[in-house]
Amino acid sequence: MRLQLCFILLHPLSTDWLLTHILIVNCQLSIVNYKKMNILLLGSGGREHAIAWKISQSPKVDKLFIAPGNAGTAQVGTNAYIKADDFAAIKDFVLANDVNMVVVGPEDPLVKGVYDFFKNDASLAGIPVIGPSKAGAQLEGSKDFAKAFMMRHNIPTARYKSITAENIAEGYAFLKSLPAPYVLKADGLAAGKGVLILETLEEAKKELGDMLNGMFGDASKTVVIEEFLTGIEC
C-alpha cells in the first residue's frame, strides 16, 4: 500500500522526475522483503548520478550497478558497459548478477518498452522495474499523444495543432492565427533539443518545414505547434 500511495502522489502529476524517481525507489526499498538487494540503474546522465548517489546510501542495498553509467556513478556503484536500450544484454546481466530491482532513469528505454520486456519474460517477471509501461511512457515519448490526453481529460494546456508533411498548409494557417513568439515541438524524443521558440512568422514557417524534413529525424515527423504561454514552469 505504501508503494501505491507513492505512485498516486507523484505520478504523473509531478514534473520533478528526479525527486519522483528517488522517492519511489525509497518506497520500494522499504517494503521489499530482501535484507540486501542488488539493484541495476539504467542510464548515463546527471540524473542517474543523483539517483545512484541516493540509492547507494540505503542499508538495504548490497550491490548497485549502473548501465552504462558515467564517471560520477562509478564513485558510488559499479558501471556495466551496456546500453540502456539493449534489452537482451540487460536480461543477461540481470540474471547473471542476481539483480533484484531495475530502476530506469532515461525516457528512451521506457518508450521502447523495457518495463513490458521484463513483465512478459517469465525469467524476469518477478523483478520490479521502477518506471511506466510502454503505453504509459507515451505521455513523455509523444507530445501529440500527451496533448490529446490532456484534451480528453480536460487538463488545462496551451492551444495546439499537430502537423505532418501531409497537412503542412494547416500548420501555416495555425501559425498565422497565433501571436508571436511561436512554439514548435518535435513529437518524439529529441534528447531535450526538440523545442524551438521563434520570434517571427517567417522563421516559424521555415523551421516547421525543416523539422518535418528531418531536422530531428523520426522525432519530428510530426510537429506540435503550441500557443506560447508566459509564466513559471511547474
Pin down the residues of each PLM region.
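ATP-binding N-terminal substructure of ATP-dependent carboxylate-amine bond-forming enzymes
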Residues: 34-132
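Acidic/polar helix N-cap motif
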Residues: 83-86, 142, 166-167, 200
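Conserved ATP-binding module of the ATP-grasp superfamily
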Residues: 155-159, 177-183, 198-234
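A conserved helix-loop-beta module that forms one wall/lid of the active-site cleft
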Residues: 124-194
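Arg/Gly-rich low-complexity intrinsically disordered repeat tracts
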Residues: 11-17, 24-34
